[in-house]
Amino acid sequence: MIQPQTHLNVADNSGARELMCIRIIGASNRRYAHIGDVIVAVIKEAVPNTPLERSEVIRAVIVRTCKELKRNNGMIIRYDDNAAVVIDQEGNPKGTRIFGAIPRELRQLNFTKIVSLAPEVL
């Protein structure tokens, strides 16, 4: 469960390393975001000499959370970290590589470009 002020790792090579959630896109008063939700975040740490800079406001989609994800078949998936992928206004990833495993629920949410770049889909 991601809420405002939560720090997340970045799971792509866009140039950002750490994000802080400042808003959850969707309903106006949602408290928590889950896997597949789009958030507005600020970059807290970035790689030098990249297009993304520290304190820049961006959009990101959540790909991993420490909170369990329950599937309809009874399977429960839990990750070791909270991670997101930086996206543009159309929902395409800004990076060209994705690091780590991502859930297959992203394919159902029309993030097919992120799923195709991922090395492992659970």
UniProtKB/Swiss-Prot annotation:
SUPFAM superfamilies: Ribosomal protein L14
Keyword Plastid: yes
GO MF term (any one): structural constituent of ribosome
UniProt keyword terms in alphabetical order: Chloroplast, Plastid, Ribonucleoprotein, Ribosomal protein, RNA-binding, rRNA-binding
Main localization category: plastid
GO biological process, one term: translation
Family annotation (CDD domains): Ribosomal_uL14 (cd00337)
The keyword Transmembrane helix is annotated on this UniProt entry: no
Assigned GO CC terms: chloroplast; cytosolic large ribosomal subunit
PROSITE patterns: RIBOSOMAL_L14
Subcellular localization, as worded in the UniProt entry: Plastid, Chloroplast
Similarity comment text for this entry: Belongs to the universal ribosomal protein uL14 family.
Function: Binds to 23S rRNA.
Assembly and interaction partners: Part of the 50S ribosomal subunit.
UniProt-recorded name of the protein: Large ribosomal subunit protein uL14c
Species this chain originates from: Carica papaya (Papaya)
Gene name of the encoded protein: rpl14
